């Protein structure tokens, strides 16, 4: 695997991929925009509290590795960043919209079941059914230029196996111990989280609109 991202690099790229699809009017992102996206409390696991300098360091590293590029001029008062990780003009990694949605959600939240992925990726791509999710995961696991995801052992109390991306190297397949008394159905939890994400993004758009009207 030629892609080797640190946890922070994966978070930054995942955020840019997400915002490119869900809030295109705010994309590319400024440093402050990337900081806000990285530290977002919805659709992030783990929740982080990165400083601007920490995010700037990751952005600089990713630009040097040609995973991002800077955008300036044409009325932009600040430098902004856009991803070149996939589907860029000269890049090698080409992904479908469904594949982008799954990879992004895995970069942002780590290992998840197909049911969780379907709900949490819904803002980026609407899967017709679970079969489409599972077939897309299998395609990512069996690509000639991959594999890009791997299926993990089933966790105690879970009906589905989890999948994890391989852009940060091999994954230690050690199922987490689950307290069955506190177990929550993954699909229901994922649907609630998807609604929280939608509310957060609508609030972000409203704040941006109000700030624009106030200028």
From Swiss-Prot:
Protein name from the UniProt record: UPF0502 protein YceH
HAMAP family for this protein: UPF0502
Similarity section: Belongs to the UPF0502 family.
InterPro entries: DUF480, WH-like_DNA-bd_sf, WH_DNA-bd_sf
PANTHER family for the chain: UPF0502 PROTEIN YCEH (PTHR38768:SF1)
Domain of life according to the entry: Bacteria
Disulfide bonds, paired cysteine numbers: none
Keywords: Acetylation
